[in-house]
């Protein structure tokens, strides 16, 4: 574990801790705070916000999601931002009720037991998990797979 910093979300006043080794978005999820997001890969801009105070390192992201002009204007992507200071962030898109009532993110290990072609462009995947998963309507899952080359790929379903 690295240094621990505090993130304050404006205008709602929610605060949480972030380790310098994790992204702001991952830290929020770990502590049960649901923030707007989509791809978690810096491609979609759903987690775009304004950094009002503090310093972050931005991991690789698409300039379609965050243009150079956006970045120069103080905008960041929470899914690609690692804190190196206490942060104050201005949320651009949020639902205050969702922020306070979200379900903490849980991590499961699993093994792919079946992979089949359903149509020409849709595949079915069965995953055997190491623990039961309670599913709520509207919930989704992020699946991270490590390739034979050691690359990790995450997709949301």
Mark where each language-model region is:
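Well-ordered beta-strand positions in beta-sheet-rich domains
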Residues: 15-17, 76, 88, 109, ...
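Preference for bulky hydrophobic residues occupying beta-strand positions
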Residues: 7, 16, 49, 89, ...
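A short, compositionally biased
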Residues: 1-5, 43-45, 83, 138
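Ferredoxin-reductase
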Residues: 100-157
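Iron-sulfur (Fe-S) cluster-binding segments and ferredoxin-like electron-carrier domains
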Residues: 8, 27-36, 46-95
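N-terminal pre-ligand scaffold of iron-sulfur
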Residues: 1-36
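Iron-sulfur (Fe-S) cluster-binding modules
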Residues: 1-2, 74, 84-90, 95-106, ...
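Short, surface-exposed secondary-structure edge patches
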Residues: 36, 41, 130-134
